[in-house]
Amino acid sequence: MKLLGLLISAFGAINALKIKALYLSCDYELRPYNAVIDSQCMAFALNGSNIHEAIRYLNAMNIDKAYVLYWNDHDLHQNPMVLHKNGALAPFDRYTNTAKHVLCVEACSCPGPQSRPVVCPENNGASVSSPCPPCGQGNNTTVCDKVVVNPQPVKPLPAPCTPCAPCESSSSEKSESKECMTFPRICKKKCGPRHGRSPKKVEIVKSQKTYTFDIERYKRRGDVVVRVCSQDCKDKFEKFVLTKTGEIRKGKDKKCIPEPLPECLQCPKNLYKLKSGIEAKVCSEVCMYINSKCEIFVLIGDCDFYKVVMNERRRKQSSFHLKKIRGQKLRELIRQGLFGVEFSPLKC
């Protein structure tokens, strides 16, 4: 009985602490328990008496879902549960049900570098200690979300969140922009005699293209110098001028006929504005890609892939939203290969 009383007291002490969310980087997204240990946190013990406070916390911080490592007296660090902000509690599944946060009750430092879109949280009626987290902290620093859930009558709401400050400059204006990863399409070709006992040889061919638009020249004249780097077993470079009317002007070498540009790249002005708008929204540099279907994707940080979906019903050309790609869809997208799209001055 004494042991039971001590356990009840311990759980009561834990529940009395402030709920905090630990943001998980890519290395910890599937191992939330390791993130809690490495950050010297105490895992939050969820039960029937505090689940409503946890739900109010998620809504106050605008967090869709978070890992829970303890439910009542059950240790779930091997197979955690995922608590959604609508109140649903479901088992963890690495393909269909993951989270970017884990609930804890101790002051913790977020483990590892990470990059994520910074959004000012909306207050849904809970008392928030820091309504607007700082924006534009960079890719190597992060701030743990902190909120105080007050079960007492709610005080008047604080002033609306001010918009995130714009990023210092876009990636195309920096002298040293980060190098984007490449995602070549890998094909296997069989060669050798079709008949006979000799084995067939398999040749692996990597196909990759990167389109670079000289936006500096575009600002001066309206024309854009385009450089296409193709990597099919060996590097091949093409360079031509794309006029503001969409016409391709060939160089001095008349024998060189540039390949036609994909339709989504024929108006680099709008594409450049789209990328700048995305970078201003997430307060971070992004890498832009297209696939063979001319669909546009961006990579934020080192592991967050998003599909850019344009809102055609709205009149503004810059109206878009980002749809995260993960799991089997992401693996299939990378397997089929992606073409890089960059905006920077051409040195040659």
From Swiss-Prot:
Where does the motif HBM2 lie? 248-256
Q: Which positions does the motif HBM3 occupy?
A: 322-327
Q: Where is this motif: HBM1?
A: 193-198
Instruction: Work out whether the entry's keyword set contains Cell cycle.
Output: no
Q: Kindly list the places in or outside the cell where this protein is found, as annotated in its UniProt entry.
A: Spore wall; Spore, Perispore
Signal sequence segment: 1-16
Instruction: Report keywords, A-Z.
Output: Cell adhesion, Glycoprotein, Signal, Sporulation
- The main location is other
List all annotated glycosylation positions. 47, 139-140
Q: Which GO terms describe its cellular component?
A: spore wall
Query: What Gene Ontology terms for biological process does this UniProt record contain?
Result: cell adhesion; sporulation resulting in formation of a cellular spore
Instruction: Give the comment on domains.
Output: Heparin-binding motifs (HBM) are characterized by an XBBXBX or XBBBXXBX sequence, where X is any neutral amino acid and B is a positively charged basic amino acid, and are defined as the consensus sequence necessary for protein-heparin interactions. HBM motifs may be involved in spore adherence to host cells.
Q: What does this protein do?
A: Spore wall protein involved in the adhesion to host cells surface glycoaminoglycans (GAGs). Microsporidian spore adherence is an integral part of activation and host cell infection.
Q: What is this protein called?
A: Spore wall and anchoring disk complex protein EnP1
Taxonomic placement: Eukaryota, Fungi, Fungi incertae sedis, Microsporidia, Unikaryonidae
Name the gene for this chain: EnP1
